[in-house]
Amino acid sequence: MLKELPNEQLNLISLCFVQDFKYKKLEIDEKLDEIVNKQITNIEKDCKKFKDAIIYFGNGYMGEKNKHGMPDGMGNLLFHASEDFYVGQFNNGLKHGLGKYTYMSGGGSAHHPFSIPYYAGEWFADSYHGLGKHLITEYESLMIYEGTHTHDKKTGFGTYKRFNNDDVDKFCNTELIGYFLDGQGFKLMIEINRDDNGSLTKNTPSGFFEYDLEKGEKTPLLLFNEIDEWEKKIEPKKMDKELLDIFNDSYKEFFNLDPFTKEFSDLTIKVKKNVMQLMFDTNKYFEKNSEDENYLKFLQKINSLNKVVTQIDEKQKLIELNEMIEKEKKEFVSIEKKLNS
């Protein structure tokens, strides 16, 4: 642990980490600006040309489709029950690529009646995955997360921002910058706490901290006395090799998690496409078989399997789930013969 190092060495290493984290933050900010304010904005403009709507799982869809009639390419999806909507790219019925999901069902919350939550960024197999920006309205303070998402979780490098009011164009009052594991600060974090004038607060320290999630504790490694120390005096800089070795050792367990592997991602989209195709094939019989109890039970079972996919974070469990889906596909072959078409 860094806090066990001699003070002189600790200060030097902490400053190097802060420089690197600032470099990563600026790099992500630049990429996110390109994704959210340029690429997705262009997709939203292009999607306005679509006029003909179809019903897709009880929701309204306007856009490009594949040969099976599933969303594929660019399009707009309006969810009937919640009035949420997604504008962006699809692959075989899945939100996949770039897009923006607006949570109309979460708008007008008691805390923030005029703020509508959304996620804009990269998607993979119906999940937030890659770089994205997430406006969060469910807490007393308005919050924004900007950074890496991994299979629907705020896992990876990013920045959490907290605002004392609903003006997100103004500076935020709290920033947490570093690596997150399912939304929780992991090990080393930069924490900036500002008052409503933009200066550092006197009661809550700002600086570079070592977090201990199990104990719920944080240890200051390098403190800032003035906001300029962070905003102007600290120059962003990539890590050198010696520091990179310390970093890799500290975060070894983090990057060895299954969701970071290509194998896990490949398996996830395979399972998602598999269950989505099965849902699509089974739901087209609904209109003429809505009173068939066996058919309805089968639909519920498939819908449950679909919800489970994004909750799994271990490769072996994904493999087991895919085996279950393959088994259900075989069962549907016999069920299909008894359905009215």
Regions found by a protein language model. Name each.
Residues 1-239, 302, 321, 325, ...:
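Intrinsically disordered, low-complexity repeat tracts enriched in Gly/Pro/Ser/Thr and acidic residues
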Residues 227, 234-341:
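PAZ/PAZ-like end-binding module
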